[in-house]
Each structure stands twice: as C-alpha cells, then as structure tokens.
C-alpha cells in the first residue's frame, strides 16, 4: 500500500488476508485483492446490506455513510473436496444428493466451486468442489446443522474436514 501511495495510486477495493495461527502467533500465508473463498461464502450469507451498495461506497469513498446490517445468529461453511486434494485428484465423479438447481433443501446455500454439469448430472471438476453453508441461532447450531446433513450429498472419494467451527 505504501508503494502504491508513493506512486500516487489509490487502492479502492477489498483486501483479503489468509491467516494461520501458529505456536509463534498468527501469520499471513496469503493476501489478495478480492474476497476470499470460502470465507466470503459464510460472511456474505449473513450480510443483509446490499453488497453492491457497499462496493459502490468503497469506490466513491463514502463507506462511512453505509449502514451495515447482518442477520442474527451464526453461519458455517464446510468444503467438500475431491480425494487427493490438494495434490492430484480425479474429475468427473457424479455428485448425488443435489436437486436440478444444484441445491439441497438441508442447507441454506450450496456454493459450486469445482463442479460441472454434464449429461444432465453434476460432476466434480476441481479440488474444492462444494461449499455447504448453514445458518443457525449461533455458530454451534449452524455447525450441528451442516454436519447432520453433509452426507446427504456425496461423490466418489469425497472428503471434508470435521473440525470447522470447533472440534466435534
């Protein structure tokens, strides 16, 4: 940011920092000029304020005039990945448990990150395939909902973490 300012360039946008907590404290592992994925999926699921209004205010320099509003409660996103990810993984595995619109009524949202629609079926097409979002009265409630239902959707060699939102 200092280098951009020194060149007379103004940054207006989103800065995303990927962090990890280590024994030595938090460390930055990446940063981007975009929303993080799947982090944005869970955060935006709670946002009630129009995102376009927010981004226009960022561009116009009037963000202090935007009244932010979020849903009450908590949210959680759990990613379903292809076996082998983040290394080599197979593509084209049929995904079961999705409706024609790519959703499942057990979840508030299912975000397609690495899917394709071939021959009338959803198939895996990446490492991080689906992001399952549930909302709840609090994070624990959302966590209970997502883990109670995530096995309703599956594909060969799929896996997901069991510790999102705290140890289970």
Where do the protein language model's features map onto the residues?
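Generic long, charged, amphipathic alpha-helical segments
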Residues: 90-131
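Generic C-terminus detector
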Residues: 115-119, 123-168
């Amino acid at each position: 940011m200092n280098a951009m300012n020194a060149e007379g360039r103004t940054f207006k946008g989103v800065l995303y920092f990927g962090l990890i907590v280590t024994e030595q404290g938090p460390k930055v592992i990446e940063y981007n000029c975009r929303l993080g994925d799947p982090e944005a999926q869970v955060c935006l699921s709670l946002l009630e304020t129009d995102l376009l209004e927010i981004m226009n205010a960022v561009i116009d320099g009037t963000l202090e005039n935007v009244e932010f509003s979020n849903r009450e409660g908590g949210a959680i996103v759990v990613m379903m990945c292809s076996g082998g990810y983040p290394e080599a993984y197979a593509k084209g595995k049929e995904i079961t448990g999705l409706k024609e619109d790519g959703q499942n009524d057990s979840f508030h949202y299912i975000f397609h990150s690495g899917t394709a629609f071939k021959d009338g079926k959803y198939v895996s097409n990446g490492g991080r395939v689906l992001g399952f979002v549930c909302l709840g009265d609090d994070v624990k409630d959302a966590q209970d909902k997502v883990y109670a239902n995530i096995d309703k959707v599956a594909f060969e060699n799929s896996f997901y973490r069991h510790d999102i939102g705290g140890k289970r």
